[in-house]
């Protein structure tokens, strides 16, 4: 389907706006995927907060110009789509990694975070990053553990005294002499 100039400009503006807010981007080859598989992938992407779009490579290059994803321009060859993570850097990587296991024809080409390109082999490291909520809960656990240990240490002398008094009381109650 050919786009007229106004439609092309609108696509470039939309992708540029999303790319400027995005944290990470993944480029993947969709050759061999069925329409149903792509529809399912798009549906899951919307649920995950990932912007997934098939755009002509020349338009994507224009949209990525002067963004941190300009480093992906060399990989925009052939039938590819872009997936932009808007909430967490690992969202798009995790989504596509899971789908690459299910749909073997989905080929992840590269990932970009912070202006650096990572190849498909390194995507597992980014996909395994915790979400923001998981990271906060782990941090809270790590911060809470020393405080709990300190409180237990402070309470131990009193508890030991109470146990000793209870043992003395039981011993005296057992021996009336």
From Swiss-Prot:
Keywords: Ribonucleoprotein, Ribosomal protein, RNA-binding, rRNA-binding. GO terms for cellular component: large ribosomal subunit. The keyword DNA repair does not apply. InterPro entries: Ribosomal_uL10, Ribosomal_uL10-like_sf, Ribosomal_uL10_bac, Ribosomal_uL10_bac_type, Ribosomal_uL10_CS_bac. One of its GO terms (biological process) is translation. CDD domains: Ribosomal_L10. One of its GO terms (molecular function) is structural constituent of ribosome. PROSITE patterns: RIBOSOMAL_L10. Gene3D superfamilies: 3.30.70.1730, 6.10.250.290. NCBIfam families: PRK00099.1-1. Forms part of the ribosomal stalk, playing a central role in the interaction of the ribosome with GTP-bound translation factors. Belongs to the universal ribosomal protein uL10 family. PANTHER family: 39S RIBOSOMAL PROTEIN L10, MITOCHONDRIAL (PTHR11560). HAMAP family: Ribosomal_uL10. Part of the ribosomal stalk of the 50S ribosomal subunit. The N-terminus interacts with L11 and the large rRNA to form the base of the stalk. The C-terminus forms an elongated spine to which L12 dimers bind in a sequential fashion forming a multimeric L10(L12)X complex. This is Large ribosomal subunit protein uL10. The gene is rplJ.
